[in-house]
Amino acid sequence: MDTIEYTEFSPPLAQRAAGLAQLGCASADGRTRLRRLYQDGSAKIRLPAVLADPLEAVLINTAGGLTGGDRIGWDVDVGTEASASITTQACEKVYRAASDQAEVRVKLTVGENGRIAWLPQETIVFDRAAFARTLDVELAAGAEALVLEATVFGRLAMGERASQGTFRDRWRVRQDGFLIHAEDFRIGPDITGALARPAAAGGVIAVATLLLVSPRAEALLDPVREIVGHQGGASVWSVKASGKLLARLYAGDGYQLRQRLVPLVGLLNGRAGLPKLWSL
């Protein structure tokens, strides 16, 4: 009797999202114009039909969210005396990870006397998500930057809370080759327990960090503190020939957080004001 041999098959690997998008702009004839646009995978960039100054760009993750093993990269290069305002089409969602972690890497480069506003909408972290984000900013002499990252751990209105998981956020900001700001935020695996600590967030689920590198930083400190209120704080330092204003905010949910982020971004983003997609 013939022997039947069985071949063992490994389970199919889950499909992972991967993408890289690069945007370059330069100043020409007194206006900021697109110089380079590259898109690969699920990372897309869209520009309004009517170009504005500063140049406006919208980032889109066509995968619809992130989960374990996904990799997304955003690279923005703003030339000398050019200006750009970057936001996202919607809130980025980080879903439960079966294995590995989702990673987002952001690189922002600004030439002399250029300006960038990095203003993505909130990142929503779901239960048992695993997420790591790195943000590297290189500023030339005289360059300005407004950088915001806001995170909401769960959606209370939907009865969802991110109780377990890991979240890592690493920032490095340099100007004229010198490190002027660095931070490493890590939370997990007990997210609820960590956020409940009085020295951490006091039980809230929505947090934001906003950094302004500009000679205007010191003059804006008092109005920033008025908007931030008692749920957060703001400080200012002199760095190189510029200034650095750092504000941190926390709130009971994403809606309450945005109620203060909207006027804060409008104040700090100069004539560009609030990104249009924030008000849709």
Swiss-Prot record:
Any one cellular-component term (Gene Ontology): cytoplasm
InterPro entries in UniProt: UreD
UniProt GO molecular function: nickel cation binding
Key words, A-Z: Chaperone, Cytoplasm, Nickel insertion
Pfam family, one: UreD
Domain of life per record: Bacteria
Subcellular location: Cytoplasm
Function in brief: Required for maturation of urease via the functional incorporation of the urease nickel metallocenter.
Family, as annotated: Belongs to the UreD family.
Oligomer status and interactors: UreD, UreF and UreG form a complex that acts as a GTP-hydrolysis-dependent molecular chaperone, activating the urease apoprotein by helping to assemble the nickel containing metallocenter of UreC. The UreE protein probably delivers the nickel.
Protein name: Urease accessory protein UreD
Species the sequence originates in: Mesorhizobium japonicum (strain LMG 29417 / CECT 9101 / MAFF 303099)
Higher taxonomy: Bacteria, Pseudomonadati, Pseudomonadota, Alphaproteobacteria, Hyphomicrobiales
